[in-house]
Every structure is written in structure tokens, then in C-alpha cells.
Amino acid sequence: MPAVRGKSKSKAPVTFGDLAIYFSQEEWEWLSPMQKDLYEDVMLENYHNLVSVGLACRRPNIIALLEKGKAPWVIEPSRRRWGPESGSKYETKKLPPNSCHKSGPSICEKPTSSQQKVPTEKAKHNKSSVPSKSKKEHSGKKSLKCNLCGKTFFRSLSLKLHQDFHTGERSYECSTCRHVFRQILSLILHQRVHNWNKSYECDKCGDIFNKKLTLMIHRRIHNGKESFHHEKASDSCPSLSLHRNNHTTDSVHQCRKCGKVFSRMSSLLLHKRSHNRKKIQKYNKYKRGFKKQPVLVHKRVCIGKKTHESKKALIQSARQKTCQSENPFMCGKCGKSFSRISALMLHQRIHTSGNPYKCDKCQKDFGRLSTLILHLRIHSGEKQFKCSKCEKVCSRLSSFIQHQKIHKRKKKLIACKECGKMFGGMKNLKVHLNIHSEEKPFKCNKCSKVFGRQSFLSEHQRIHTGEKPYQCEECGKAFSHRISLTRHKRIHSEDRPYECDLCGKAFSQSAHLAQHERIHTGEKPYACKICKKSFAQRISLILHERSHTGERPYECNECGKAFSSGSDLIRHQRSHSSEKPYECSKCGKAYSRSSSLIRHQSIHSEETP
């Protein structure tokens, strides 16, 4: 059983022996890895706290072993090994470390030099390991044998602790909650739960600490007392030399897991907690631990599948298989997924009319506070973004950024060879080409179109359903994609930074300017692969290709009739609703199609002389 060192007197200073706990080899082996780590952290922290206030002058062997990552158990002489304390015959319950109750003076009275090797449990005894006289003096002690398994022990407490495992006896009871434990270390670890909220208050400044030792260190600030000064006590205490290491730039404490070094033990203890927080996935077949990406490769090795040839393919596959687990909160209306429920709640305000932020002047509602702040600038007339080149002032940062693109050098548009989409630079084109090269496991059930991500498929399916979850706050117009809403909002802003050099017409987007310039140049970069017919706009090519394939993705919910374009579906739906949005300004007659209104207006033009 581990023995707690003898308690100090009421007026005596705190020593390392008052805080230390020692184990035999058998007791140490019974501890779990988590208990060993906690024991190591607590012992090192207590020792270095004592060193910082000058209360520990000699460096115990057990501290040297712990800092080197070696087992700190007390060795019994029959095992013929050497531990942190010399021999089991030494009474560990009443004497400080490195002392013998029979031989008198401490064997390790003198501190070991830096070149001396600290003996460990792996080092065997030789003639110079332990004095022969001391060895003979303790050889007469009888060993104790377990009646159940025949194992021998040299301490009655060790035998009692061993027999508890046969009987299942739990002899250590918590005085607070009456919970019973088999080992004293388990009881000590358990009592930290009750003592966690225990506070120690400074009677001078009122600062509160959760440890009594920390309060003692703090009180030295008010007392102005220091045990050792750099100028006076040069070599009087090894604790001072150890304390001086904190002021040097040399890193002396190294993490055994990652190799990182620190100048202070407290920093190392804080760093070691970061390793414990890391969650590592375990594959049940071999009980091996992996991080996210390697576990995918390991699973394929176990089931006989080929691994990915490149890291890029591995990341793409992991993204496809874990997209739902990484974003567990999915919107029930548009299918978009989020990693946090707060982001989902903020997103759902787009679909609902419950906009919590209201303008006091025009009573308009907004879903986000940032949108309301931008809206208030309309009433106040505030314009804070001023262009340094042309003195133009914009009320929004996005409009200011778009305006600055006018003064930048125009980039030559580069077309994608796969789909014909235009880009302003090679960098953007390379990013776009990844769409064509990656795997597309998500397939649409209606038109058989494939996509690389689930979110792309969800956005595409809105074409068939006609769902438009994104609504403009200015005019109420709805869109099926967020990017379409973003582009539409630029119509309401007065800023049109992209101007045609030939006719002076201005546009809010560079893509619209590029399409307009083709009217002057006659360029038609989009060619049909079947009939070789060319078009100036990409959407015109897409609509034309549907005449060859017969694809009609837009279906009417009322009668089931399908159309190749969304505008044809909108015109058809007006036949069910009898809606006639096109009204003549002269006679008030209304039509469901704009072409019918144009033909009607020709009648009024003929009547005029």
C-alpha cells in the first residue's frame, strides 16, 4: 500500500515528504496509465512549487526518475533491482526519501552530479550499488507469503493490498460521500472532486486560490520575504540553481510524446494536457488508433480494398463520406447542412418571416443585425467608403470593392475547355477545373445529372421542384440559389462599376459586361458539339443543347407538363392562375406574355398620325 510521508508539525515548513506518495513495483503495476500520468503530473507540480519558494533544497531521486520518464516505484531487495529509494527494508512511512531507519545517515546524502547516472529499475545491482554492510544488516527480515497464490512480499501492507484483489475488499472510504475504494490512490484521486471548489482567500488583498500552497506563494508578495537571493546565496541551495533555469533561455523540459521543449515544468504540464484532449478514432478490427485521414486508408487495408494513390484523392473521398457527419444539422426546406445548431437557426430565418431586427423608421424587418445596420445608412445618408482615385463615395463595403475593380487592369477572360465558362485569371480557372476532375457520386433521380457534393445536388433539385428559398429583402423577389440573390441585390444599389468602353453602358457585374461586349465584337465562344452552332451566351447554348437531348427539367406541379427552360414554365403557369402581368399603359389591357403586349402596342402606334 502506498505510504504517505509523515505529517509535518504545525509550525514547521512544508517539505516534499509531506506531499509525496511512494509505491512498490507491484503497486505501480496495478495502476492504470491514466493514474500513472496523473501521479507524475501531481508529484512534479508539487516539487517545482516547493522549489519556487525555496522549500526544497535537495532533488529527490524520484523526481529525477519522473522527469526522465522512468518508473518511480520503491524496489524490494530480493528483486535485485534499484529503484528511486534504496531497498524495501527502508521504512517509507516515517522517514524521508533516501534514508534508512537502521543505518542512520542517508545513503544518498550528497547530491548527484550531472554526469552521474541515476539508477533505474532496469539496472542490476553490482558490488558498488549498495553498501555491503547495510545489505547484511537487513538480511534477517522474513518474507510474507500469500496463502491463496503463494506470492511473497517483504511488507505486510503490500501483502494486505495484494489480498484485497482476491477478496474484493474495499477498505478506503471517502469521508465526504462514503464511497469506498480498494487503493488509496483511487481515494486520493476521488477526493479531488470534493476539494476542487475549495478556496483559500488571502487576508490582505482578498485574492482567492484553489490550493493552499499557491496561497503560501502569493503571501510572499505581501511579506516581501525571499528565502534565497541571487546575489547572496550562490551555491547554498540547489533549489536556487534550479530556479535560475527559469530566467535562462535554455529549454530543459522536453515532452516525451512530441519532443517539444519548455523552460518551465508548469508550461510542460499544461502542454501535456493538449495530448490528452485529442480524440483519436479507433478501428475495432486491430484496436489501432488513427486520426481522421489515416483511418480511412487502414480500413481499406483490412477489407482488401486498394488505397488512394494520392493525398488529394484521399481528401476527396473522405469529404464525400463524412459530409453528413461533419454537418449534422440540416435545413428541412433547402437541404443545406451546418456544423452548429446556431448556424442552422440563423439560416432558417431566410425561409421564415420571423425577422427579429426591425427598422424604426420604415418598419422593415431583417433577419440579421448586420443587414439592419447597412439598411439604416439609407435613412441617415451615411457614406463612409470613398475611392481615392475618382472621389466616388459608397455606402457599402461590397459596393466599394466592386467599384475599385474599374481602376484595376482588365484581365483577359479565359474559357474552360470542358464547359466553356469564362474566368478572369488562370488561378480561378485551375480551381474550376477541379470540378471536372473529381468524382461525382451524387446523381439526380429526375435528369440523371451527377455532382461531386451533396450540397450541389440539393441546389440542382430546386430546378425540378421550383423551390426558391432565398428572398430579396428589398423587392421580395425569390431565388433558388444564394449566389443568384447576391447578384440580384446589386441591382438595388446605385453602384455599377463595370462600364462599356464603346457605348458607355454600365453593369453591376463583370460577367454582364463581358456578355454585352460580345454584341459589339460579334464573338460567339460557345459552340454546340452536335451541330456546331455558336452562341454569345452560355445559357443560350444550354437551352439549345436540350433541343438535341430532349431534356425538359422544368415540370409544372398542376398538370405535369415539362419544359426545357424556366421562363417557358413561368409562362405556362400563368394559364392556370390567369395572371396577366403585362399591362398596356394607354388602354389598360393586360396580357400574360410580353410578346402579346408588344403586338398590342403596335395598334396604338398605327393610330397615331
Swiss-Prot record:
Cellular-component GO terms for this entry: nucleus
Matching InterPro entries: KRAB, KRAB_dom_sf, Znf_C2H2_sf, Znf_C2H2_type
Cross-referenced SMART domains: KRAB, ZnF_C2H2
Broad class of the protein's primary localization: nucleus
Listed Basic and acidic residues bias regions: 81-94
Record-linked Gene3D superfamilies: 6.10.140.140, Classic Zinc Finger
ZnF (C2H2-type) residues: 144-166, 172-194, 200-222, 253-275, 329-351, 357-379, 385-407, 414-436, 442-464, 470-492, 498-520, 526-548, 554-576, 582-604
GO biological process per UniProt: regulation of DNA-templated transcription
Function: May be involved in transcriptional regulation.
The name this protein goes by in its record: Zinc finger protein 667
Species the sequence originates in: Mus musculus
Gene behind this protein: Znf667
